[in-house]
Swiss-Prot record:
The gene is SPPL4. This is Signal peptide peptidase-like 4. Residues 26-193, 268-276, 339-343, 395-427, 482-485 are lumenal. A motif (PAL) lies at residues 490-492. It comes from Oryza sativa subsp. japonica. Its main location: membrane. One of its GO terms (molecular function) is aspartic endopeptidase activity, intramembrane cleaving.
Length: 545
């Protein structure tokens, strides 16, 4: 409760940036280049819907994964055949089935022999397809051995996770069961990605204007203090920068190192209880961010309450407006945490996340382009390493595993913005890590602060073009995401070159790069030179520093 502390903002920045580099399309079975492709065993891995009917009445639907071998599975529901389902005897189908199949689909258990042998036995018995029940609750990719060069399997094979397979097997006790197998194609672009793009760009836009407005108010206050006399200006640094954190070169480098350690900790300790801990941390940050945003908005209409303070134990002086808003924020976060597995819980998560990002960008600042370049360049390498290169050591992408929450029963860690894919037959979410918004947002907020301080127009400044560059980079990220069959992409791989490159190129073209690089603020002629003890101080920046 109370004004957001710089220490908390810095800590939240670290937690959010640990998930800097992921934009993903949610749950999907991807192509696997490590699985061998040989003649007769070269299918792409696809998700398969298994629609069921019991006694000619439509029942549940299950989702499995198609095999590398066999014919491709029909993509159109209206073209898929509806056939009967039989439980294999023997149930593992490692020996030829004893019953007459006659075009039905065989349901078998995994184990005791190869997938290809089960499929061959089922085909020889006259089955039209085979559904294999896995012995664990996850999906598994059915592949072939490299020495199986004479495969000629002509029926599709689908693997179901253990729980889905057992439920399907129980349906057989209720009567005659028939199934329909098909694998609908995903849309090339889903509207969720468009809305996620708008959310990311809009968040940076709002945060940048708030940051620039706060900086301008600080300058106005600074000038008032200077007019009051030289003694007041001696306390300027403490008063003018209260509640703000300026990142320096050392912290920019250490930031990425510590974020890497934190990401490894998330990867190694990822479990149900650890996700619960992250939810608590996210709720604390979300309450702080939502409260800060609401107080800033409402203070214009409830100015007396915003300017009247009361001392609260452990929190110090707190405004009456903050006391009034805080319970609402706490209740909002608690309700989201309790019901976060509900269908529409993503709305609450996004509201808390956006408020948190906006607050951190308003508090944490990049002082100049040099620090911003180091921070974003390190984040760029961090992103690429943990999304792509980490596979060499961990045999999976650490960043994507953590972001999706693969080792838990959750839909992912809460430090993400997410929107459900509305027109995707497979459902799921489009997601983007907080760091993909926050880190470029720090640079873009710096651009707007500089533009306002230099009294630049929108077209002659840096903010507009940085925003365009960020939006373009994020758009390219989603193009790459779709071209790569939904594989999670390191968003900063595309965003950083666009955003930082545009900023540096414009600064160099306009001859302002040196000033942007070192000072981070324009030259300002000081109107209070008579108050300075030394004639060598020739501008207002010297006064404020």
């Amino acid at each position: 409760m109370g004004t957001s502390s710089p220490e908390m903002a810095a800590a939240l920045l670290l937690v959010m940036a640990a998930l800097a580099g992921v934009a993903a399309g949610g749950d999907i079975v991807h192509q696997d280049d490590e699985a061998p492709k040989i003649p007769g065993c070269s299918n792409d891995f696809v998700l398969v819907k298994v629609q069921t009917w019991v006694n000619n009445r439509e029942d549940g639907e299950f989702v499995g994964v198609g095999a590398r071998f066999g014919p491709t599975i029909e993509s159109k529901e209206k073209h898929a055949n509806r056939t009967g389902l039989l439980l294999a005897d023997p149930i593992d189908c490692c020996d030829p089935p004893t019953q007459k199949v006659a075009g039905d689909v065989l349901l078998v258990q995994r184990g005791n022999c190869k997938f290809t042998k089960k499929a061959k036995n089922a085909e020889a018995a006259g089955a039209s397809a085979i559904i294999i029940i896995n012995h664990v609750h996850e999906l598994y990719k059915m592949v072939c051995d490299r020495n199986e060069t004479d495969l000629d399997i002509n029926i599709p094979a689908v693997l179901l996770p253990k729980d889905a397979g057992n439920d399907l097997q129980k349906l057989l006790t209720r009567g005659k069961v028939s199934v329909q197998l098909y694998s609908p194609d995903r849309p090339l672009v889903d509207t969720a990605e468009v809305f996620l793009w708008l959310m990311a760009v809009g968040t940076i836009l709002c945060a940048s204007y708030w940051s620039a407005w706060s900086a301008r108010e600080a300058v106005i206050e600074q000038e008032k203090l200077l007019k009051d006399g030289h003694e007041s200006s001696l306390n300027l640094e403490a008063g003018g920068s209260s509640g703000m954190v300026d990142i320096n070169m050392t912290s920019a480098i250490l930031f990425v190192v510590i974020a890497s350690c934190f990401l490894i900790m998330l990867y190694k300790l990822m479990s149900h209880w650890f996700v619960e801990l992250l939810v608590v941390i996210f709720c604390i940050g979300g309450v702080e961010g939502l409260q800060t945003c609401l107080v800033a908005l409402l203070s214009r209409w409830f100015k007396p309450a915003a300017e009247s303070f009361v001392k609260v134990p452990f929190f110090g002086a707190v405004s009456y407006l903050t006391i009034a808003v805080c319970p609402f924020c706490i209740v909002f976060a608690v309700i989201w945490a309790v019901y976060r597995r509900m269908t529409y819980a993503w709305i609450g998560q996004d509201i808390l996340g956006i408020a948190l990002i906006v607050t951190v960008i308003q508090i944490v600042r990049i002082p100049n382009l040099k620090v911003g370049s180091v921070l974003l360049s390190c984040s760029f390498l961090y992103d690429i390493f943990w999304v792509f290169i980490s596979k060499m050591w961990f045999h999976e992408s650490v960043m994507i595993v953590v972001a999706r929450g693969d080792k838990t029963d959750e839909d992912g860690v809460p430090m993400l913005l997410k929107i459900p894919r509305m027109f995707d037959p497979w459902g799921g979410f489009s997601i983007i890590g907080f760091g993909d918004i926050l880190l470029p947002g720090l640079l873009i907020a710096f651009a707007l602060r500089y533009d306002w301080a230099a009294k630049k127009t929108l077209q002659s400044g840096y903010f507009l073009w940085s925003m365009v560059a960020y939006g373009s980079g994020l758009m390219i990220t989603y193009v790459a995401l779709n071209l790569m069959d939904g594989h999670g992409q390191p968003a900063l791989l595309y965003i950083v070159p666009f955003t930082l490159g545009t900023f540096i190129a414009l600064g160099r073209k306009r001859g302002e790069l040196r000033n942007l690089w070192t000072r981070g603020q324009p030259e300002r002629v000081c109107t209070h030179m008579h108050m300075q003890p030394s004639p060598k101080d020739t501008n207002c920046d010297a006064v404020s520093s």
